[in-house]
Amino acid sequence: MARYNAEASKNENKGWISMNQIEKLLAIGACTLWASSAAVHAAAGDDGIARFRATYKELVETNTSLSVGDCTLAAQRMAAHLKQAGYPDEDVRIFVPDGHPKEGGLIAVLHGTDPKLKAILMLAHVDVVEAKREDWTRDPFTLIEEDGYFYGRGTSDMKAQAAIWVDNMVRFREEGFKPKRSIKLALTCGEETNSALNGAGWLAEHERAAIDAQFALTEGVDGDLDAQGHRIALEILAAEKISQNFVFEVTNAGGHSSRPVPDNAIYHLVRAVDRVSQYEFPVQLNDANRAYFTGMAKIVGGEKGAAMTAVLANPSDGAAVATLDKNVDWHAMLRTTCVATMLSAGHATNALPQRASANINCRIFPGVPREEVLTQLSKIAADPAVKVSIPEVRGPIAPPAPLTPQILKPIETVAHQLWPGVPVVPALEPGASDAQFLNPAGIPTYGVTGIFTDPDGGHIHGLNERVRVQSVYEGRTFLYRLVKMYANQ
């Protein structure tokens, strides 16, 4: 997701990289214009673009939503590309957790030459958020290229990167590439739905050896574009929030709708949910958002840059916080956030409701216990009739992976090759990724895509999801070079 929403601001509508390193990164400049797509592809030899696009199209057009989709089918289709490239059966494996026939995934490996070096893991989820055809302008499960964009569910989150990982494996095999480290690929299901079986978590628990690696690469943050399409910065995931659902529930005896009473379950619930909408959790700073705002202050400049600097000096500076809060991404990076996402109430149109409930999805700031948020939500509800609970806990809480020079330097190197002058900036991701399962399992996991996105974030999880065609092709070049560099460290 793009962090710097220049248009929205204008209209007012993990160990860590040090501050000295940030200064060096930003010394090379604030932003650059788009280079020509042809130039970047020429630099990469433009090998197999049509084949990659076909793989991407096949993946997008395989419905992998939880309700009616089939991740196992998507994994099988991607496995076919690897086998066609010459991978033996023992190096390409479909896994299907018991009781979840359509929630399977893929594990594959290109063996390295140095058995003393641990592997690098390329991780992607292939499941997508639900998409209703009647709500979309275009068919969400048809890859449509229009006006310089790819449209379709999963085009941005995250089938572009999943297709790039598959494409990398095919290219490496066909080139006869002999990496020092083994290169592993894992495509999983269940990342997008908290109540679903998570494939990455399942692998960490049941197939730990198969995905064992020195570190893993996955989604998390993208490159930032402004409203004019100028590159602002390439972000690296330095930390991420934890996604946790809470339930507000009210029950009572109900009754006949002709005899209304003040003690109405819906009224209790609506008032409590409204109080959630008005509450702001306090500003918190850690290494990740400090590094981000330190870097972005120099890029953004002006009133907003000054506000970033002021908040870093004093998180209680109300005026500075108010300035940053006008940008939805910056607002989310500064604190825990909670929002109502689903409502359910009543049992008949002519009866007083016996039950009313709401799902409150919170993105919890790193290091804050779930129980602390539960306690605060109970205080916010401020009504003994409203019971607040945690329906399920998804994944353990673990510290983020350290951004060591071994990880950071190759990213800087490849970014400079492709986009001279664009700074590399660590970021705190307000969302969550499968890193939440791999980091606790002892596999440091980093989010970097090389895909630059618009200020609207490409409408991920929303209607008419899209990503720039050029961004996808450049991300392909970036990740191809980056993985090769890591594999020979």
Whereabouts are the PLM-identified features?
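Acidic/His- and Gly-rich active-site-bordering loop/insert found
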Residues: 43-153, 172-181, 360
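An extended, acidic, His-containing surface patch that forms the Zn2+-binding/catalytic region
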Residues: 115-117, 224-225, 284-350, 354-355, ...
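Acidic/histidine-rich catalytic neighborhood of metal-dependent amide-processing enzymes
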Residues: 149-150, 156-235
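Bacterial N-terminal signal peptides
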Residues: 27-37
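Bacterial N-terminal signal peptides that target proteins for export
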Residues: 16-27
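A short core secondary-structure module
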Residues: 201-205, 258-282
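Sec/Tat signal peptide C-region and signal peptidase I cleavage site
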Residues: 38-42
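Short, Lys/Arg-enriched N-terminal segments with co-localized hydrophobic residues
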Residues: 1-18
